[in-house]
Amino acid sequence: MMQYAPLDISKIKNLISEIEENVLALKEFSSMPFEEFKADKKNYGLCEHHLRRALEGVLTIGAHILSRLPVKTKDYQEIILSLGKLGIIPNDFAEKNKKLASYRNRMTHIYWEISSKEIYEITQEHLADIEKFCEYYLDYARKQK
């Protein structure tokens, strides 16, 4: 039987700290009314930056966990779905949040299609989900010790 490398708990904790910092910055935007958010053009760029970094962290940790298991994924969305299928995160949570992986791809590869309204709505609807990913990852990491 093949032996897989142990999780790098330090890496996971460092990435979670980064995610938490970015979510904290995003909470400033989520508490603004949309008109106020839209009025200052800098808000869009800052929000996009922090959201991309938070999502990159979520996906990097997911990929790290899966790299220690006999699982193959071909894209970011499969990372989230595989985590659900394996019970690392609840399957319904994975289904609900798989679009965050697609959103990360859109922010990176077709960023010009993302409106200020769309990025604002993501900060309104998904910051708690990003925080929940961190909780699930820490729970899983603790069980692996």
Predicted feature locations:
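Solvent-exposed interaction patches of small proteins and small membrane subunits
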Residues: M1-K145
